[in-house]
Design a protein with these regions (language model features):
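TPR alpha-solenoid repeat register
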Residues: 68, 112-114, 155, 189
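Helix-turn-helix repeat elements of alpha-solenoid scaffolds
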Residues: 41-56, 88-97, 131-136
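Short coil turns that delineate tetratricopeptide repeat
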Residues: 63, 107-109, 150
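N-terminal leader/linker segments that initiate helical-solenoid repeat arrays
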Residues: 17-54, 58
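TPR/TPR-like (Sel1-like) alpha-helical repeat modules
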Residues: 96-100, 133-139, 169-187
Length: 228
């Protein structure tokens, strides 16, 4: 009887442990979204630092879980925009290393978010010798994220953004449309809906650039015919 009770308590405590981790991660994601989308830019740096400290503590408590490590990397990377150049460069290198560590632990964690974030870092970071920016690695990571989560808002949006940055407009349009129609998570409606709005703006920009390119091509053809 005592043994059965002991086993039941162990199972219950491990379940509570998992739920506490999930709750903590959800709170971190909600707070990050609030800082990123709603906090005035001049106040974001201190808020990110405060949230980063909490996330680092959570990662220490759960060293075998990839999720807190991914969030530590995300916060470091987004806070880099509010730091001086030297500190920002150090931060994105640290974020990259954290994401690689998270992938080693569990590549499927957070529906492949480590690959999304790492891919985004690869195409936004400065190239060698200053940074580690690499278009080929970026696309590989973002495509891996899509294989893990083909219907995700973030996986489709950020691959679309990568394609847009490389002037691959037709492909970018397709992935922005997928991001817009992807289902939002009930527990993170605010963050997901804000990213959907960004996808709509990106799609509008993509179509505008396509139209400009078409007009430019038509003008070139017209001018060449006039010369003849």
């Amino acid at each position: 009887m005592k043994k059965t009770t002991f086993v039941a308590l162990l199972l219950l405590s491990s379940q509570c442990f998992a739920e506490n981790l999930d709750d903590s991660l959800q709170n971190i994601e909600s707070e990050w979204a609030s800082i990123y989308y709603s906090t005035p830019k001049q106040k974001r740096g201190p808020e990110y630092c405060r949230l980063l400290e909490r996330t680092i503590n959570l990662a220490r408590q759960h060293p075998k879980n990839a999720e807190p490590i991914i969030w530590e990397a995300i916060i470091k990377a987004t806070n880099a925009d509010h730091q001086d150049a030297v500190s920002a460069l150090k931060a994105i290198h640290e974020a990259r290393d954290l994401l690689l560590k998270a992938i080693e632990i569990n590549p499927q964690a957070m529906s492949g978010s480590a690959y999304v974030t790492l891919g985004t870092l690869y195409y936004m970071a400065p190239k060698w010798p200053i940074g580690f920016g690499d278009e080929t690695s970026a696309e590989k990571m973002l495509q891996t994220a899509l294989k893990i989560n083909p219907n995700g808002i973030d996986s489709n949006y950020f691959y679309g953004d990568f394609l847009l940055s490389n002037n691959r407009l037709n492909e970018a349009e397709k992935y922005f449309k997928r991001a817009i129609t992807a289902p939002a998570r009930t527990e993170q409606l605010y963050a997901d809906n804000r990213l959907k709005e960004e996808a709509k703006l990106a799609l509008k920009n993509t179509k505008k650039r396509k139209n400009s390119s078409s007009k430019g091509l038509f003008a070139s053809l017209f001018n060449s015919e006039s010369v003849k």
